Design a protein with these regions (language model features):
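Acidic, surface-exposed loops and disordered segments
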Residues: 1-118
Length: 118
């Protein structure tokens, strides 16, 4: 499986690997698969388990390795495991985390329209 994702180390070092597979059907299956993946990762985080979603670089090889038959297809590979060092998400601001990940700052891609009142 590691040879079929963009970051093989995230799979090789994982204690558990989950491959989310979808079947065509009604609704937004890719959207639902993303929500399922996010739910698994958030549940793991709540229990002290880290995770890393991986994009699939060779879908055909992954399908062969796992005997996934069309029309089913894998959409994401998630590695789960124990943190390699203590977690401290508050050691950086959201802006610092975004910069470290080489992502655009939120204020450059988010537009706030009006005020939200609760």
């Amino acid at each position: 499986i590691a040879d079929t994702v963009y970051r093989p180390g995230n799979v090789l070092d994982a204690g558990l690997v989950v491959v989310v597979v979808v079947s065509p059907g009604g609704g937004l299956v890719d959207f639902d698969a993303g929500r399922a993946a996010q739910s698994m990762m958030l549940a793991g985080w709540a229990e002290g388990i880290t995770s890393c979603p991986n994009g699939i670089s060779d879908a055909d090889a992954l399908a062969r390795a796992l005997a996934i038959e069309p029309p089913e297809r894998a959409v994401v590979v998630i590695g789960f495991g124990a943190p390699s060092k203590p977690r401290d998400p508050e050691r950086r601001t959201p802006e610092e985390w975004s910069a470290r990940a080489k992502r655009l700052p939120l204020d450059s891609i988010v537009t706030h329209v009006g005020a939200v009142h609760g």
